[in-house]
Amino acid sequence: MGRRPARCYRYCKNKPYPKSRFCRGVPDAKIRIFDLGRKKAKVDEFPLCGHMVSDEYEQLSSEALEAARICANKYMVKSCGKDGFHIRVRLHPFHVIRINKMLSCAGADRLQTGMRGAFGKPQGTVARVHIGQVIMSIRTKLQNKEHVIEALRRAKFKFPGRQKIHISKKWGFTKFNADEFEDMVAEKRLIPDGCGVKYIPSRGPLDKWRALHS
């Protein structure tokens, strides 16, 4: 018996059911890589950030997440080069879905019990997504805005339900507004740290502040 179609598991009906010592024998999720492209690019290299935002409360299978990741990556590599972007899948499939296997061969009624003992065996994993939750983000250079929108539009076709594409006002994957970011870095209130930044608050030891601004 093959994999049941994902439309059977689209809606969030039950409580979250993660892999645990009580729920064993769960097959591995199809998606294993969540960051691709130029992951180690400094925070100031990729100021533009685009998000794919869910418009429904639903479940997305790990197969769909993997398909969307491959689709977006393929388009971005073709249009921006393999070092011109950084994609991050923001969902992780932790919810385990079950299947109560039914036999369909001749004489099956003697072998199986129908709906008696109908609690199924683990079949795969899905990610539960809320309205307004980000599914996937891409950061890149400002001139690649159209390519980001097109890559996310193509990836949208891999998912059920509705998604929106949103170009963020923040700088890259940080939580700081793009129009204030460079000023805050110049004032040393933000210190670049990989693909993120460290925020230096205006309180604390004075000698530490002097050492930073010397």
Curated annotation (Swiss-Prot):
Q: Which GO terms describe its molecular function?
A: RNA binding; structural constituent of ribosome; translation regulator activity
Q: How does it assemble?
A: Component of the large ribosomal subunit. Mature ribosomes consist of a small (40S) and a large (60S) subunit. The 40S subunit contains about 33 different proteins and 1 molecule of RNA (18S). The 60S subunit contains about 49 different proteins and 3 molecules of RNA (28S, 5.8S and 5S).
Citrulline occurs at which residues? R32
Name listed for the protein in its UniProt record: Large ribosomal subunit protein uL16
Q: What is the effect of changing A64V?
A: In MRXS35; increased the formation of actively translating ribosomes when expressed in a yeast heterologous system
GO terms under cellular component:
cytosol; cytosolic large ribosomal subunit; cytosolic ribosome; endoplasmic reticulum; membrane; nucleus; protein-containing complex
Q: Which PROSITE patterns match?
A: RIBOSOMAL_L10E
Give the protein family.
Belongs to the universal ribosomal protein uL16 family.
Question: Where does the record put the Glycyl lysine isopeptide (Lys-Gly) (interchain with G-Cter in SUMO2) cross-link?
Answer: K175
Q: Which GO terms describe its biological process?
A: cytoplasmic translation; embryonic brain development; negative regulation of apoptotic process; negative regulation of transcription by RNA polymerase II; regulation of translation; translation
One Pfam family per UniProt: Ribosomal_L16
